[in-house]
Amino acid sequence: MSNDTSSRPCAPAPDALPPGDMDLVESVRVPGDGGKLTLLRRGEEFSLRVHGTELMNSRVHESEDALSELAAAKLAGISSPVVLIGGLGMGFTLAAALKRFDAGAKVVVAELVSQVVAWNRGPLGPLAGHPLNDPRVVVREMDVARILQSEEDAYHAILLDVDNGPEGLVHGSNDWLYTEDGLWAAFTALHPGGVLAVWSAGPDRAFLMRLRKTGFEAEEVRIRVQAPDCGSRDTLWIARRPA
């Protein structure tokens, strides 16, 4: 994993591929002002899109895996952690978390769109090894913001893989998560010493500054996706609430 932001020319990223040669599995309306979320399939490959823009492709999940791995590394030595994941996606973040946390862990997944949960129990399940079947997992079909606003000192780690990061595409209310108020809610929902890990499709210097202003000890990490020597980079922020 590198903080280097350079990138070499190579084949187009998966989100540049046209959806025309993919088969429609299902489209659903995101609650509130979120528009239409579409699940597409081409052979064993799946794509989640909104407004014609790809949010996730099953061929590329290095940064989703890294989100869980980096958060877990910060909690080394803590047994039976309680973890909150905002956003289920295709289950890769959840699956990576289950691999890194012990048998006594409890992992709460907040997913606003109930059909995304159904897709993960159906056609998307095999992609990440059916993580929803793990007995450590509790699914709450609700906005993760409601959980953050209602709980204090509840979690050892909070992983936000919601929308497209601070520059959201799916649901306008997601923007609140990345404001000072949203970050303060996450800060207070963590145990002292707890970790907030945030996924984004791109860097955002102002967001890093907001994390630090809230009181987090925060760093920005760039994760290369696709081939090891070329491709795009996603951005992760790993932030710790001081003990």
Tell me the role of every PLM-derived stretch:
Residues 1-49:
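N-terminal auxiliary segments of SAM/dcSAM-dependent transferases
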Residues 3, 7, 61-192, 198-201, ...:
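The AdoMet/dcAdoMet-binding core of the Class I SAM-like
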Residues 28-32, 36, 48-80:
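Class I SAM-dependent methyltransferase Rossmann-like catalytic core
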Residues 44-51, 161-166:
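Short, basic/glycine-rich phosphate-binding loops at helix/coil junctions
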Residues 237-243:
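C-terminal lobe and adjacent flexible extensions of AdoMet/dcAdoMet transferase-like proteins
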